[in-house]
């Protein structure tokens, strides 16, 4: 079989050329990173869980008319996606104060915000993904005013969808981040949700206990990350609650 051409390798995923023009194969790694990759570990099974969860969320968004880059899951670790022109921004939607917002504004973690607050960060690991305003985005040409209007609309629709989905299984959606890319159909351009949606990119707290079920488990050494992600997948019905562990094949005499 011909060796696939690697396009890009990031902290959590590898992108390969897809089988058809305009497609990409997105491979989910087991690598976990925090604090802009200052803290690293390999968490067995994390890539499989994130692949399945991102498929679940992207498919659900498609069903309610939110465009995404997702085409189909190929196997346990890979999915086929549309090639997009990524806008170099992380779009963060916050429903409750946590993380950098708590530190920046002196808000107690878990404080409910008056309404969902949308923030933008410029994607640059060397700079620590700095917070930017719409003025920066327009001035540096990262996105047009129409793009910004569309990004805001997409982000809030994703928030409505994810918040309701999580609330239904006893999980609070504290905040999340998405990336958005441009796709072109002839002369027509539209924006789609790209990258991934998983516990790597969301803050998820158990409503009753406040227990964290996201990457903060790794950031703050709060327990087993794979167990937390598995619980999210099981609550959402993405994985069966009594899944049989995968074992090595045994020989039958």
Swiss-Prot record:
The species is Roseobacter denitrificans (strain ATCC 33942 / OCh 114) (Erythrobacter sp. (strain OCh 114))
Q: Which domain of life is it from?
A: Bacteria
Tell me what this protein is called.
Answer: Phosphoribosylaminoimidazole-succinocarboxamide synthase
Q: Which top-level enzyme class is recorded in the Swiss-Prot or TrEMBL entry?
A: ligase
Record-linked Gene3D superfamilies: ATP-grasp fold, B domain (3.30.470.20), Phosphorylase Kinase, domain 1 (3.30.200.20)
Q: Give the matching InterPro entries.
A: SAICAR_synt/ADE2_N, SAICAR_synt_PurC, SAICAR_synth, SAICAR_synthetase, SAICAR_synthetase_CS
Name the gene behind this protein.
Answer: purC
One annotated Gene Ontology cellular component of this protein: cytosol
Lineage of this protein's species?
Answer: Bacteria, Pseudomonadati, Pseudomonadota, Alphaproteobacteria, Rhodobacterales
State the SUPFAM superfamilies in the record. SAICAR synthase-like
């Amino acid at each position: 079989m011909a060796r696939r051409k690697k396009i890009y390798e990031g902290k959590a995923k590898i992108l390969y050329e897809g089988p058809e023009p305009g497609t990409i194969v997105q491979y989910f790694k087991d690598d976990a990173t925090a604090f802009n990759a200052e803290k690293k570990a390999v968490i067995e099974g994390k890539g499989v869980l994130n692949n399945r969860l991102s498929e679940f969320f992207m498919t659900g968004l498609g069903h309610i008319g939110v465009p995404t880059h997702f085409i189909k899951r190929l196997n346990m670790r890979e999915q086929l996606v549309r090639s997009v022109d990524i806008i170099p921004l992380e779009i963060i939607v916050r429903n409750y104060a946590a993380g950098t917002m708590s530190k920046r504004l002196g808000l107690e973690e878990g404080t409910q915000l008056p309404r969902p607050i949308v923030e933008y960060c410029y994607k640059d690991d060397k700079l620590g993904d700095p917070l930017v305003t719409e003025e920066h985005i327009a001035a540096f040409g990262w996105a047009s005013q129409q793009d910004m209007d569309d990004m805001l609309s997409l982000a809030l629709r994703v928030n409505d969808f994810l918040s309701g989905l999580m609330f239904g299984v006893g999980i609070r959606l504290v905040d999340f981040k998405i990336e958005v890319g441009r796709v072109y159909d002839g002369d027509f351009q539209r924006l789609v949700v790209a990258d991934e949606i998983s516990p790597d990119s969301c803050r998820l707290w158990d409503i009753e206990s406040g227990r964290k079920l996201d990457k903060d488990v790794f950031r703050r050494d709060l327990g087993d990350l794979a167990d937390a992600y598995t619980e999210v997948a099981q609550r959402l019905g993405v994985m069966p609650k009594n899944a049989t562990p995968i074992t090595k094949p045994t020989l039958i005499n």
